[in-house]
Amino acid sequence: MQDTAKYLVHADITADGVVERSDVVGAVFGQTEGLLGDELDLRELQDASKVGRIDVEIDSENGQSFGRITIATSLDRVETAILGGALETIDRVGPCRSAIEVRKIEDVRSAKRREVVERAKSLLDGAFDESMRSSRDLVEEVRESVRVEDITDYEGLPAGPAVADSDAIVVVEGRADVLTLLQYGIKNAVAVEGTNVPEAVASLTETRTVTAFLDNDRGGELIRKELGQVGDIDYVATPPDGKCVEDLARHEVMSALREKVPYGRFKQAASDDADPEAAEQRTGEAAGATAADSEPAATDGIGGVTTDAEGKPVSSPESPAESPAADETAAVSAGTTPADAEEAAVDGATKTSTAGEEPNTPDDELTATSEAAEPGSAETKGESTAAEAPESSADGPAAAGASTDEQPKTLRGHVSDVIEAETGTFRLLDAEFAPLAAGDAGDVFEAVADAETVPAAVVVDGEASQRLLDIAAQRGIDHVVAASTGEFVKRPTSVRVRTATQLLNPEKA
């Protein structure tokens, strides 16, 4: 009956005396018999399984009894309510007066519905965690599988598929960083996986253009410092503050790589941040040098030649504001062509950039020496100073005869000695175009790679190959002059490459 019951009738009973359970059951059947007719008689309803067992719980205390009566029924709501009203007509249980009050009629189906709701909640919370997945999860899983398939190993380290063949690589911290870059189409990344830089990565950086793309935390700083000691870093890229490389969006990755800076400049900026007093001192020294150079000198009025306090001719430095038109005018007045004046300015230039500066230095930023700026100064006074010797040796026959054993002091002079003379050799020159090393043209690559002092220029009586240009760019060389040039797959922007013809005879080039 409990399985088919629709309603439960809950009633409270009190009696003025001590009664037993059997007394209560007998009173229920006896006092309701014939009260509601045959169709609603309790015995008939029990026989028809429309009313279940009558449950009675009774207790006695201080000469009184009290308890609860529960009757299960499958009748409809109206008949159940009539049955509840009939129970309240019972006024005696055994020899004692009593009172019965129906407390509530419970809908069993409602109780079952509550159980169903509670169970459904628990199932919804736990049963679907593993089986139900959103479309975003599915897309991410497929994308991750593709990225994992693309990642390869380089000497046991996570790397993109293009690391082995690419002439430029991106060094990152871990496997997750490589996966992030792969997702955005960057396939030449290799991970060091820890603060101890592997020898494979250190060796790889010596022959490739290297960009260190590491986090801005302590670990990234240590890796960058060690990589700069055991390997060769060309550029440094950093993620936005507070973010790791593996968490960057596509536009953040591309922006960081576009805004990479040369390693030397990055180190200088880092040292300035660590020691602001030294940076301020360097700034003051530079300002003082500029002020000293800008002091006006006296003019003797003869041919516009500038003289110092002792009356000796001095050449004024070229003004930064001079335009190409002014250069051409000066060249014509000195009896030379504009092209010759431009080449003389390049030959007498002083190397101002270091290995850590921005490689894309325009040619017009090379500052010509005072001798190239005023070739007629010595002729006007009839005397020549030691500082004017480089230009005089290239253009003045008298100066050339004075010391035939001296090395040329200009790039043109070295090109004439090495390439025009068809010596089959090379020369490495410093910033003042003084020779650092020389040898057979076939050994120029090894000489550049092993040079203790980084040369400013290379003059070789042979072909300027892609291999030579790559090592020149890595070492920070500004000029390469060769007898001929080969086919270049990638021409470095930091190295100015010319043939001897282009330098000595630009009108024939």
From Swiss-Prot:
Q: Which GO terms describe its biological process?
A: DNA replication, synthesis of primer
Catalytic activity, per the record? Answer: ssDNA + n NTP = ssDNA/pppN(pN)n-1 hybrid + (n-1) diphosphate
Q: Where is the Toprim domain?
A: 167-253
Q: What is its EC number?
A: 2.7.7.101
| Named cofactor requirement(s) | Mg(2+)
Judging by the UniProt lineage, the source's domain of life is Archaea
One Pfam family this chain carries? Answer: Toprim_4
Residues recorded as binding Mg(2+) 2, renumbered to this chain, are D215, D217
> Which InterPro entries did the record assign?
DnaG_primase (IPR050219), Primase_DnaG_arc (IPR020607), TOPRIM_DnaG/twinkle (IPR034154), TOPRIM_dom (IPR006171)
* Manner of cofactor binding, per the entry note: Binds two Mg(2+) per subunit.
Q: Which GO terms describe its molecular function?
A: DNA-directed RNA polymerase activity; metal ion binding; poly(A) binding
The residues that the entry says bind Mg(2+) 1 are E173, D215
Query: What are the alphabetically sorted keywords of the record?
Result: DNA replication, DNA-directed RNA polymerase, Magnesium, Metal-binding, Nucleotidyltransferase, Primosome, Transcription, Transferase
Q: Name one GO cellular component term.
A: cytoplasm
Q: What class of enzyme is it?
A: transferase
**Biased composition annotated in UniProt, kind: Low complexity:** 313-331, 383-402
Q: Which SUPFAM superfamilies match?
A: DNA primase core (SSF56731)
Q: Where is this region: Disordered?
A: 267-411
Q: What does this protein do?
A: RNA polymerase that catalyzes the synthesis of short RNA molecules used as primers for DNA polymerase during DNA replication.
The record describes its quaternary structure and partners as: Forms a ternary complex with MCM helicase and DNA.
Report the sequence similarity comment from the record. Belongs to the archaeal DnaG primase family.
The protein here is known as DNA primase DnaG
- Lineage summary: Archaea, Methanobacteriati, Methanobacteriota, Stenosarchaea group, Halobacteria
